[in-house]
Amino acid sequence: MHAQGFLCSKHAMSEPIRLIVGLGNPGPDYETTRHNAGFWLADRLADDLRATFALEKGFMGMVAKARFEGENVLLLKPITYMNRSGQAVGALARFYKLAPEQVLVLHDELDLLPGQVKMKQGGGHAGHNGLKDIQAALGTPNFWRLRLGIGHPRTLNLAQQVADFVLHPPRRDEQAEIDTVIDRCRAVVPALLRGDFAQATRQLHTA
């Protein structure tokens, strides 16, 4: 797989997504925690694309290489822990000469309830350390994000602090809602890989 295979025509209406990044923390202690929602979706997308994650130490992450309609697509799960996710994203994007607009980051979102999801390009990081580090590594906030709602302890009537909340598993009803959202996201990814962001947005936000 050669880096130049990921370059897209400058005449394209929109740059299709070529790197999908799931955010989370590595290791069995974190597998089921809310902060790993991005990993959960990345795993399902790898299954959908018939790709397998393998450790690539040079990119500081688990990388899956897929093909979609004749084009190369990368999936990444950084193993740097959440706060240093940008190290892996930046290394992979630079090697394959990907523009920030070709990067889609999947992450947990405190400001959305379980069962809610929003997609956007650019914007702030709202205190999410993974997004903050990626923004610093890419030198811009102009990458795409799929924000997977996990709720906030305050809105869910829990006494936990946020740092504790995100490192615990969702309750059963919350997990069911998150799983439903993951399936909705899986359905729109083909449009994102074609560069049809308008269709993906309509499909995701009207489901």
From Swiss-Prot:
The record marks 108 as: Stabilizes the basic form of H active site to accept a proton. This is Peptidyl-tRNA hydrolase. Its main location: cytoplasm. It is found in: Cytoplasm. TRNA binds at residues 30, 81, 83, 129. Pfam families: Pept_tRNA_hydro. Its EC number is 3.1.1.29. GO terms for molecular function: peptidyl-tRNA hydrolase activity; tRNA binding. Belongs to the PTH family. The record marks 25 as: Discriminates between blocked and unblocked aminoacyl-tRNA. SUPFAM superfamilies: Peptidyl-tRNA hydrolase-like. Monomer. Keywords: Cytoplasm, Hydrolase, RNA-binding, tRNA-binding. GO terms for biological process: protein quality control for misfolded or incompletely synthesized proteins; rescue of stalled ribosome. The active site is at residue 35. The keyword RNA-binding applies.
